[in-house]
């Protein structure tokens, strides 16, 4: 099963998750979290939602803050992940969003508070002993300098020639499917 976790200030109804499903030709479970809630509550909710649908051939795909959550979920659920521009230092990288925000996907207005910011860890520790593939952009306009942090943290790493947002998953689909079937068994289609 492919799971997708959206980035900051978005939702599970985002176009990115839908694009992943269309381009992979596979069912994708888009998982959502509320950016106005504390990190641990979001992680617990995401992990529980994924656990209910896991079939043993699972990969969690995440973009930006969703990449951060995907790594934390992979560690908690002992499964694979493929992440794109994962937020490596969420506490400092999210600071610029303190105050009023408008959700990109829903248009809903909300407040990002100091208490919520403080609920995030200082940095992402790449899951050790788990198959995790990380991609990072050299031209990340949202998280400048993040790519170098990703490169240092992940053993299975690749640079991409794009901006922060994943505009097309097609060139990554084979890798995502490989991680979904890391045990070498293909689910019947």
Annotate each predicted stretch with a short phrase:
Residues 59-60, 81:
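Conserved alpha/beta-hydrolase fold motif
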């Amino acid at each position: 099963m492919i799971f997708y976790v959206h980035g900051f200030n978005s939702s599970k109804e985002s176009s990115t998750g839908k694009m992943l499903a269309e381009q992979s030709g596979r069912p994708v479970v888009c998982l959502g979290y509320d950016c106005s809630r504390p990190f641990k509550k979001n992680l617990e909710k995401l992990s529980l939602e994924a656990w209910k649908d896991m079939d043993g051939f699972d990969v969690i795909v995440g973009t930006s803050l969703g990449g951060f959550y995907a790594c934390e979920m992979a560690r908690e659920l002992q499964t694979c992940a493929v992440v794109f521009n994962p937020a490596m230092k969420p506490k400092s990288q999210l600071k610029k969003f303190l105050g009023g925000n408008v959700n990109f996907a829903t248009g809903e207005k909300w407040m990002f508070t100091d208490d919520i910011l403080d609920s995030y860890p200082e940095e992402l520790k790449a899951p050790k002993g788990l198959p995790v593939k990380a991609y990072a952009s050299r031209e990340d306009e949202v998280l400048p300098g993040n790519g170098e942090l990703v490169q240092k943290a992940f053993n299975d790493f690749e640079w991409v020639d794009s901006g922060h947002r994943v505009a097309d998953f097609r060139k990554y689909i084979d890798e995502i499917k490989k991680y979904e079937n890391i045990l070498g068994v293909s689910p019947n289609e």
